Amino acid sequence: MANTAQARKRARQNTKRRQNSASQRSMVRTYLKRVDAAIAAKDYDAATEAYKKAVPVLDRMADKGILHKNKAARRKSRLNKTIKGLLA
């Protein structure tokens, strides 16, 4: 338990930040699920549209520190590679 005023304030801040981060991570997962669903349906056009919507979200979360920048880049790269494979 926090004993000082500073520690109590930090605990409050951490709780609020954790909730915000969880919400934003959930949003990222939702966008990625839409891309994955389009890929599973082998629908190139839908997958491309979903990917174009997911990329800025991934970039924003990487900038905010919700996701590591390398993880965001890796996910974008793998999704793009999979989508390009739908044409082959």
UniProtKB/Swiss-Prot annotation:
Single GO term (MF): small ribosomal subunit rRNA binding
Domain of life: Bacteria
GO annotation, cellular component aspect: cytosol; small ribosomal subunit
Bias type Basic residues, positions: 7-19
UniProt xrefs under InterPro entries: Ribosomal_bS20 (IPR002583), Ribosomal_bS20_sf (IPR036510)
Biological-process GO terms, alphabetical: translation
UniProt keyword terms in alphabetical order: Ribonucleoprotein, Ribosomal protein, RNA-binding, rRNA-binding
Chain segments carrying region Disordered: 1-26
Family per record: Belongs to the bacterial ribosomal protein bS20 family.
HAMAP family the record matches: Ribosomal_bS20
PANTHER family: 30S RIBOSOMAL PROTEIN S20 (PTHR33398), SMALL RIBOSOMAL SUBUNIT PROTEIN BS20C (PTHR33398:SF1)
NCBIfam families given in the database record: S20
Function, as annotated: Binds directly to 16S ribosomal RNA.
The protein's name: Small ribosomal subunit protein bS20
This protein's encoding gene: rpsT
